[in-house]
């Protein structure tokens, strides 16, 4: 990341190759001592020939604190995740939602800080499958924003030193009764950097653990 010859497009491509390789080599999730297939939607292409699911884990969005700057008359992020990270040196977008090169949906902007943390995806998944104490996991029923249907989520959180990474899967079942798990659908994963998100996940984990 501190390479003086840093090239943004090359870095994005290399990050995408890591993403593809990991899900090519790791197709199962071990939940309650049973291995289940992982499914991932890579057909919904969004930008630069890469799927929306990839851009979601490598970008910032409204959930990261967008507000309207009344002086500059534009939307801005309240916190830059890379402010104390070397990725800030190489970022050409600077979280500027008005940059014409951005073609992501839903007020999202590519984030090389989150891209630089892509290796945590593999680390966290491997540790979860190994039942490592470095992993906290919990399940939570949520309502889909699009369909308004209830869904059950599995959230996996990896923390070590300055690393704080979360992965989310949706439970999929063999039939409508939802009595038997058939697979897990990968939803998203990202480095956590803001206190609000950290506290929300802390609360969810404590609430789940108290009922276990």
Residues covered by each model-derived region:
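Ribonuclease/tRNase effector modules and their secretory precursors
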Residues: 1-212
């Amino acid at each position: 990341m501190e390479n003086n010859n840093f090239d943004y497009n090359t870095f994005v491509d290399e990050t995408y190759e890591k993403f593809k390789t990991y899900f090519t080599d790791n197709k199962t999730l071990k939940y309650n001592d049973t291995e289940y297939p992982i499914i991932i939607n890579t057909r919904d292409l969004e930008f630069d020939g890469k799927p929306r699911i990839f851009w979601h884990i490598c970008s910032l969005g409204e959930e990261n604190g967008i507000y309207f700057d009344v002086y500059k008359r534009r939307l801005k992020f309240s916190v830059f995740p890379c402010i104390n990270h070397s990725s800030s040196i190489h970022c050409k977008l600077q979280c500027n939602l008005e940059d014409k090169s951005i073609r992501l949906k839903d007020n999202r902007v590519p984030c090389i800080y989150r891209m630089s943390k892509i290796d945590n995806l593999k680390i966290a998944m491997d540790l979860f499958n190994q039942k490592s104490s470095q992993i906290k996991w919990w399940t939570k029923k949520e309502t889909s924003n699009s369909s308004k249907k209830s869904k059950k989520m599995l959230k996996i959180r990896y923390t070590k030193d300055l690393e704080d990474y979360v992965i989310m899967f949706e439970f999929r079942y063999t039939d409508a009764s939802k009595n038997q798990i058939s697979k897990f659908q990968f939803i998203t994963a990202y480095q956590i950097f803001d206190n609000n998100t950290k506290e929300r996940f802390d609360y969810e984990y404590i609430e789940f653990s108290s009922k276990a």
